A protein has these predicted regions:
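Structured mid-to-C-terminal alpha-helical surface segments
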Residues: 1-164
Length: 164
């Protein structure tokens, strides 16, 4: 029927799902958890090392503190599910399935962080990032991470000024 094809740049699946997991933990919206459900239900995806690596990078550059995203208390999705999700997808997914996905993500993702991931995140918030712990040579140049480090430096200075 159509004789035209196009090529468009897209995110690598590790970047896509790494960022989706940050969004799912942060916003706790059914749309994000639907995508995480897809990741878990696709045999070649799941919490693959490259996906968790990308998650750590997106988490490192997120505007909220790392611990607030990674260990956020779960919120009810019932209202957003009814008002903003039902009818959005071709495949019907019930709220219970999305809540089970949320539970699984909260349980499994912290356990999937390697010692290198944990050490990198700690070094970042300590304002002494050890870039060698992550597989991306360009990480120190990402604007979101540079912004995060600038804000952490300002916070450290404010704290020191109040203290003494």
């Amino acid at each position: 029927m159509f004789n035209t094809s196009i090529t468009v740049p897209t995110l690598h699946e590790a970047e896509l799902y790494g960022s989706k997991m940050v969004a799912a933990l942060d916003r706790q919206h059914p749309r994000d958890l639907f995508d995480v459900l897809h990741m878990y239900s696709t045999p070649t995806l799941g919490l693959r090392r490259d996906i968790v690596d990308a998650f750590v990078c997106y988490l490192a550059g997120h505007n909220r503190p790392i611990h607030e995203v990674l260990f956020a208390p779960k919120h009810s999705m019932a209202g957003a599910y009814e008002k903003e999700f039902v009818g959005l997808t071709i495949e019907a997914v019930d709220l219970t399935t999305l809540e089970a996905t949320q539970d699984k993500l909260h349980r499994e993702l912290p356990a999937a962080l390697t010692p290198e991931h944990r050490e990198f995140l700690f070094s970042l918030v300590s304002l002494e990032p050890d870039w060698s712990l992550m597989p991306y040579g360009y990480l120190s140049e990402l604007p979101a991470i540079r912004w995060k480090l600038q804000n952490l430096e300002k916070l450290k200075k404010k704290s020191a000024d109040r203290c003494c």
